[in-house]
Amino acid sequence: MQIVMFDRQSIFIHGMKISLQQRIPGVSIQGASQADELWQKLESYPEALVMLDGDQDGEFCYWLLQKTVVQFPEVKVLITATDCNKRWLQEVIHFNVLAIVPRDSTVETFALAVNSAAMGMMFLPGDWRTTPEKDIKDLKSLSARQREILTMLAAGESNKEIGRALNISTGTVKAHLESLYRRLEVKNRTQAAMMLNISS
């Protein structure tokens, strides 16, 4: 597993490198402090997990994530932040952000978040966002099959895996997902999975 840490504190990168390498076999961690440096590393590892320092300026982080996801659509993102309730964090979730972890979390929590994000699963703090009534109503309006598919999607299953488990074609899975996205007013798998996670 390749991780690129974009962080203003080299000591945080160093500490995380030592700690995660002790807990995740075969993990390789590189640090970057400039946007060009990050993109250069992602040229070599376009499917890497990016750990972004969320304590930097919100507008800068938004810009960086937007640019990064356009250039490297396969990249997965984990954000570390002292305050996980910053408004901009909710606005960037659709930029392949799969995990948001408080910077003072234990190493075990970071390892769990990294492994979850690497598998395409969401990892968000329990109190990360208050659940709007609308989200719950939208989820209740889904059919039983759509809820089933959404649950599997949130667990990181691919369309092919969902189709195999439910004995339906991948085309049918895709059609269900498109209908589900419209119903929930979301644009992608990550946003749909997040709605399920925050309402449960």
Swiss-Prot record:
A GO MF label: DNA binding
PANTHER family attached to this UniProt entry: HTH-TYPE TRANSCRIPTIONAL REGULATOR YHJB-RELATED
HTH luxR-type domain residues: 135-200
Pfam families, per the entry: GerE
Annotated keywords: DNA-binding, Transcription, Transcription regulation
Feature: DNA-binding region: 159-178
Source taxonomy: Bacteria, Pseudomonadati, Pseudomonadota, Gammaproteobacteria, Enterobacterales
Annotated protein name in UniProt: Putative HTH-type transcriptional regulator YhjB
Domain of life, source organism: Bacteria
Classification via SMART domains: HTH_LUXR
Segment forming the signal sequence: none
Species this chain originates from: Escherichia coli (strain K12)
GO biological processes: regulation of DNA-templated transcription
